């Protein structure tokens, strides 16, 4: 086994001032939200303005900060330059779709075309996340945040979210190319995309504008100077398996990733004879140690940050601020200063 010589913290991410988009994700239940909120807090200390966005339908950042957020950015209590928002997964979905049961008065060709168009839009994987993503990016583009942190949904949803710019770029390009053949349907397309009742030419112009924005976003997501993905896992088989799958998919999509957080690690206490006091803790520690060794072998070119399992949950700005220091100060069980990080 090769020893991981890279710094075991997220300091490299915090120091990379060119980053605009930072995704934090992994398997469900590994502590993604705590990690993403902690990262946003650390970034707020060195960047002009930081926005953290929840794309997880569970919307845990409200619980993490003990403050209610909604679909517009709100200042996080206790911070001058940290903002948060939670987007709804069903934005722009059912209400804007055509009712397939309604008879068309414009003839069979137009009716058939509408059904085909609806199937094209409705058949996109993760259409609810896609519409949410589209509206969210329009909002963010109109603002001036220095860096944006995404607290993402579990792996499958996140991969669809990241595929959306490429997918929609291809779809919009094809729709624009079909303008001459399907001009009567362009107005219908405008309604589906929330562009309002506008003419076919206006719809095409709006689609071109949207396509330009999507192309810029797609390009930025594939630029390692602007975008990176921080993977969060725990030292168990299923989580490690899903992390490897996630990293392979990110690599396939040309999205940079070089940081892994291993969360909820157990550091059992020993008695005066050097024996672990709790047998179950000792067994769990042995399992985690095995997977930590595998992580060190598999990801020797990654910065691997190890975070402890605490006795109580991390909730509220104060506890999150204290916990966030673990991202830049490697955890040391024997250090008295570490114990102070969890105090109010």
UniProtKB/Swiss-Prot annotation:
User: What keywords appear on the UniProt entry?
Assistant: ATP-binding, Cytoplasm, Endoplasmic reticulum, Hydrolase, Metal-binding, Nucleotide-binding, Transport, Zinc
Query: Which molecular function terms from Gene Ontology are attached?
Result: ATP binding; ATP hydrolysis activity; metal ion binding
Official protein name in the record:
ATPase ASNA1 homolog
Q: Which GO terms describe its biological process?
A: detoxification of arsenic-containing substance; positive regulation of insulin secretion; tail-anchored membrane protein insertion into ER membrane
Q: List the disulfide bonds.
A: none
State where the protein is found.
Answer: Cytoplasm; Endoplasmic reticulum
Catalytic residue positions: 56
EC class (word): hydrolase
Q: Which organism is it from?
A: Brugia malayi (Filarial nematode worm)
Which family does the similarity line name?
A: Belongs to the arsA ATPase family.
